[in-house]
């Protein structure tokens, strides 16, 4: 046993053991109707994953945990605790759909009132809590990148409790639900297929990049219709003009992994690159291209690995990406909604993929709303893109801020503007003046023939309209099942045009009339409901705890490997202490007159594998990046604490 592991175990033993609170909620999913208690889990290593299905970081962690589920089999039980951010996420049917959509193959506790969230003092999505086989909490960690450390910890716990005789093997509580079959399954995005004849050979499930195998449907000539990302089937589908008749399928689980955004390249770019259709291959963290003439699929950007840093650029095939969600063509480049890093990137296409380059176009990777110069702007999971008809800007559906935003060219460079939306924790269905109107987690956007904008207001189940000339927001349609995209289907004249909506949770494309008269809905303004933490006014110490996993240590050879960024909404809450600098502690000065606020904290820490005997970090050691963003509601009280402690990784 490495000395690091022994030290890690000794550290846990030295700390007073805390019995895990019971798992309490509205009910369970993926258990065949059975309830789960901590007593029934005794003898297993348990990992609780506090998540919410809107959260891109939570989806990343789901993917990080899959290999652990497979590796440890009947020794580990993974429990998802779904504690919702948005009102829509508290809906039981919506949660069931999300569990299927994201292939969650473990039990999930439905925690709509945040009962278990509060019992475990969770403060961020995602949060992981590890329980030993005797039912005690042994570790808590927030954010992404913990898979390696979890594996080391689980190995340690298995060895320890095998020796003690307290480890129990055997089947876990997971029961797979029925798997329904539909033509489309949780479709993501739609675009219009080219009306000109293009010979295309449908392709089936492929296992190698740059492949072209047939699904057996034979050759056909495209005559319009639509391309749809059939996300849960991991394919791109060509549908006829009726939106229902299948003409061809491209890809499959061996090629795509939850494809989202689609982009038909302009004629010049098609001729230059030999590719026709680009695909945002979200979980593979790549941009892929389809050649319609023979079904060839190849990677044009990304390495297949998730980007852990929050910047990058250079040769596209050597640059990792992070959950690209949508694509648009603007100023002779491909704009990428990089949802995983809360940024917009640009892809420049050369004559071959080896000549392609990528660069960050807008966003610092901090989550939130900040307008102005693109390099200083903040986004939060941008998920929908549409280029304006005059080419002056790109419309952006910024999902986690429930906002409609745009990127345009200014005298100084690129500029970001918010048209509708208030911030990370404000949402609702409110029409009227744009500065007071509210959306709820929009995923799609398109420009209408009159220059106004249609937004797929996903969690409100609606299509909303923003009119830039009047500054008004109205509602075009309601009662839709998580609309994730919307496009305009033109008629012979503008008056004959209609909308085509991707109803993701209904697994279909739905035509919607484009009427001159729109509804005006005076719904409720809502905020994410989490109990605020009390805090004192004046000087307060912010402390982020980070204990590297056994076998790793912070590497100080080139300076402090940590970074802490702090801000607040409203900004006046912090009289001092805002900003970005190294270190995991910060003295904040809080203005008593403000009363309450959301404290935004972003942290990064890099730990490297150390020598098992000396603990020293070798010159070419493998390093691991740990990062998390918190949005913590705070309220000032007279006897509030003067220390705020957040766990990035506590053991």
Model feature map: region roles:
Residues 2-38:
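N-terminal "domain-start" segment that seeds a small globular fold
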Residues 50-67, 551-554:
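Conserved redox-active cysteine motifs that mediate thiol-disulfide chemistry
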């Amino acid at each position: 046993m490495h000395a690091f592991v022994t030290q890690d175990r000794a550290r846990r033993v030295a700390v007073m053991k805390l019995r895990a609170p019971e798992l309490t909620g509205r009910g369970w999913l993926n258990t065949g109707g059975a309830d789960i208690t901590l007593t029934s889990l005794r003898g297993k290593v348990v990992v609780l994953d506090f998540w919410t299905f809107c959260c891109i970081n939570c989806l990343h962690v789901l993917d990080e945990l899959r290999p652990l589920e497979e590796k440890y089999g009947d020794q580990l039980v993974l429990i998802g605790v779904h504690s919702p951010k948005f009102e829509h996420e508290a809906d039981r049917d919506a949660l069931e759909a999300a569990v299927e959509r994201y292939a969650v193959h473990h039990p999930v506790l439905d925690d709509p009132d945040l009962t278990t969230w509060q019992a475990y003092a969770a403060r961020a999505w995602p949060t992981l809590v590890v329980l030993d086989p005797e039912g005690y909490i042994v570790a808590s960690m927030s954010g992404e990148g913990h898979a390696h450390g979890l594996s080391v910890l689980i190995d340690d716990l298995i060895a320890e409790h095998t020796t003690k005789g307290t480890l129990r093997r055997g089947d876990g509580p997971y029961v797979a639900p029925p798997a329904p079959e539909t033509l489309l399954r949780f479709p993501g995005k739609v675009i219009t297929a080219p009306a000109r004849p293009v010979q295309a050979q449908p392709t089936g499930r492929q296992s190698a990049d740059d492949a072209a195998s047939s699904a057996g449907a034979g050759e056909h000539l495209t005559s319009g219709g639509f391309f749809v990302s059939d996300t849960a089937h991991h394919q791109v589908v060509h549908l006829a003009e009726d939106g229902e008749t299948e003409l061809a399928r491209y890809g499959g689980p061996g090629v795509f992994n939850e494809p989202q955004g689609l982009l038909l390249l302009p004629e010049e770019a098609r001729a230059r690159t030999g590719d026709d259709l680009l695909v945002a291959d979200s979980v593979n963290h790549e941009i892929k291209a389809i050649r319609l003439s023979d079904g060839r699929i190849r990677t044009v950007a990304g390495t297949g690995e998730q980007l852990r840093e929050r910047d990058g650029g250079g040769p596209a095939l050597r640059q990792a990406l992070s959950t690209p969600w949508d694509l648009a063509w603007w100023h002779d480049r491909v704009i990428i909604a990089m949802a995983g890093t809360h940024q917009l990137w640009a892809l420049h296409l050369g004559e071959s993929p080896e000549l392609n380059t990528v660069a960050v176009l807008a966003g610092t990777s901090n989550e939130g709303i900040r307008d102005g110069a693109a390099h200083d702007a903040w986004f939060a999971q941008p998920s929908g893109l549409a280029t304006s008809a005059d080419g002056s800007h790109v419309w952006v559906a910024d999902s986690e801020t429930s906002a409609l935003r745009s990127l345009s060219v200014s005298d100084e460079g690129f500029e970001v503007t918010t048209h509708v939306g208030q911030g990370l924790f404000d949402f609702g269905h409110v029409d009227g003046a744009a500065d007071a109107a509210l959306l709820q987690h929009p995923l799609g956007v398109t420009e209408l023939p009159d220059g106004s904008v249609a937004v797929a207001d996903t969690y409100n189940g609606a299509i909303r309209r923003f009119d830039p000339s009047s500054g008004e927001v109205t509602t075009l349609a309601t009662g839709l099942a998580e609309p994730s995209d919307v496009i305009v289907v033109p008629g012979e004249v503008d008056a004959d045009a209609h909308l085509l909506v991707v109803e993701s949770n209904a697994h279909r494309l739905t035509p919607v009339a484009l009427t001159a008269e729109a509804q005006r809905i005076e719904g409720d303004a809502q905020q994410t409901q989490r109990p605020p933490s009390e805090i004192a006014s004046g000087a307060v110490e912010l402390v982020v705890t980070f204990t590297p996993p056994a076998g790793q240590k912070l590497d100080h050879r080139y300076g402090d490997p940590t970074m802490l960024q702090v801000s607040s909404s409203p900004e006046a809450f912090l009289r001092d202490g805002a900003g970005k600098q190294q270190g995991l502690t910060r003295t904040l000065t809080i203005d008593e007159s403000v009363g309450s606020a959301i404290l935004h904290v972003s942290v990064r820490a890099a730990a490297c594998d150390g020598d098992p005997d000396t603990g020293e970090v070798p010159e070419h050691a493998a390093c691991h990046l740990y990062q998390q963003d918190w949005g913590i509601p705070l309220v000032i009280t007279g006897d509030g604490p003067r220390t705020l402690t957040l766990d990035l990784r506590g053991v």
